[in-house]
Amino acid sequence: MNPREIRRMMAQMGIKSTEMSDVKQVIFKGKDKDYIIDNASVTMIEAQGQKTFQVLGNLREVKKEVEQYSEDDIKLVMEQAKVTREKAIEALKAANGEPAQAILNLTS
């Protein structure tokens, strides 16, 4: 069977296939690690009201870092120093988890 016949048969069965050419990366968020597919080639297949995605690419796994600072400390540093969450966490790391020192480091 050639690809043209396959597409025609799929159309007769009500199956629609769409290449998602603008997708470059796919990330699946797991409990302990993330699965990242780079150089992704994604095809969406629609059949019987359901959408299924076929993903091809280069898989890499990234373990999640256990957050060691309380949400309250992070928010306090963010609000007082007027910085992003990432900057607040970096400042807390540099200040050994001490919010007051993190704020002083960011504002002075």
Curated annotation (Swiss-Prot):
Pfam families: NAC, UBA_HYPK. InterPro entries: NAC-like_UBA, NAC_A/B_dom_sf, NAC_arc, Nas_poly-pep-assoc_cplx_dom, UBA-like_sf. GO terms for biological process: protein transport. GO terms for molecular function: RNA binding. It comes from the Archaea. The keyword Transport applies. Keywords: Protein transport, RNA-binding, Transport. Residues 1-68 form the NAC-A/B domain. The keyword Transmembrane helix does not apply. SMART domains: NAC. CDD domains: UBA_AeNAC. Contacts the emerging nascent chain on the ribosome. Belongs to the NAC-alpha family. Homodimer. Interacts with the ribosome. Binds ribosomal RNA. HAMAP family: NAC_arch. This is Nascent polypeptide-associated complex protein. It comes from Picrophilus torridus (strain ATCC 700027 / DSM 9790 / JCM 10055 / NBRC 100828 / KAW 2/3). The gene is nac.
